[in-house]
Amino acid sequence: MAGSSFGRLFRITTWGESHGPALGVVIDGCPPGIPLAPEDIQRDLERRRPGKRLTSPRGEPDRVEILSGVFQGVTTGTPISLVIFNRDVRSGDYTELAEVYRPGHGDRTYEQKYGVRDWRGGGRSSGRETAARVAAGAVARKFLAGRGVEVKAYTVAFAGLHVDSFNRDEIDRNPFFCPDATAAAAMERRVEELRDAGDSCGGVVEVSARGCPAGLGEPVFDKLDARLAGALMSVGAVKGVEIGAGFAAAAMLGSENNDPLTPDGYASNNAGGVLAGISTGMDIVARAAVKPIPSISKPQQTVNTRGEPVTLSIKGRHDVSAIPRIVPVCEAMVLLVLADFMLHPAPVEKR
């Protein structure tokens, strides 16, 4: 199976399955001399971890171990290998799915492509794989922090509910990573309603990056916004991405969408911090549309591996929504893209 690596200069390869012994990531290209301890990675993993009140009850501690690439608390420039052991695997919950295709999942497409599939929670296609991405993103965060770049993701829509205000300090005060406390409370009530109904929901995650210098990105086929979109679309539950004004720009006039230039910089940021594929120096802003979790207890129609009709009600430990756990995953993917581009040739300074 190809496709488990991401990045060019700051390059990662994730490995492992949802119900295997462990999962992890190898990071190649991280510069030497960056202070890095397990606690730096653990903080981000805690934000994604299952077993919390509004997420899957699967009780994974997600303790990371650094196997290589760090000596005396700093990176050495050699490949960094991180491992997270699976501690709460219950493959028996999935036995009845061995011969049934789950609607909305990759069961059938994996089998059509490879002739075999891991039915224990989806194997590589499981959201559990994203723990490795978050671990890698934490390393990228340490690298970028030394260059003044800060990346933050948060929920702006959930099950049809939208934020009406933005308080950056509120993001880490609620389980949805939502900048609007009132909206977060409504989201929590909605989770309980959907859980009782045996259904699920999606939402929208926004990611913003502050402190990015102008000049990141390459023209034509390696544009910064193209790489950001591809990175976010690689997350399993993401079905759409927009940068800056995004799809709203289609309804604007040119005079409304253009970001006027002033002696002090840009007067607005409809471009989302990227023009012609190259960063402008403004905040980079991207949004990801997240689909509902397909594993629901509400009865659904499907077929088994013999093509026979089946009514399926999925049991097991599942989230009502990929939000909030997908929020740090989207954050990690943007961190990885920016770290990669920061290692490209530096922008030419104006003389």
UniProtKB/Swiss-Prot annotation:
Gene Ontology BP term (one): chorismate biosynthetic process
Cofactor binding note: Reduced FMN (FMNH(2)).
Region Disordered: start-end pairs: 39-60
Positions bound to FMN: 124-126, 276, 291-295, 317
UniProt pathway: Metabolic intermediate biosynthesis; chorismate biosynthesis; chorismate from D-erythrose 4-phosphate and phosphoenolpyruvate: step 7/7
Cofactor field: FMNH2
Domain of life: Bacteria
Pfam families tied to this protein: Chorismate_synt
InterPro entries: Chorismate_synth, Chorismate_synth_AroC_sf, Chorismate_synthase_CS
SUPFAM superfamilies: Chorismate synthase, AroC
EC number(s) reported in the record: 4.2.3.5
Keywords on record: Amino-acid biosynthesis, Aromatic amino acid biosynthesis, FAD, Flavoprotein, FMN, Lyase, NADP
Family the entry assigns: Belongs to the chorismate synthase family.
Record's protein name: Chorismate synthase
Species name: Syntrophobacter fumaroxidans (strain DSM 10017 / MPOB)
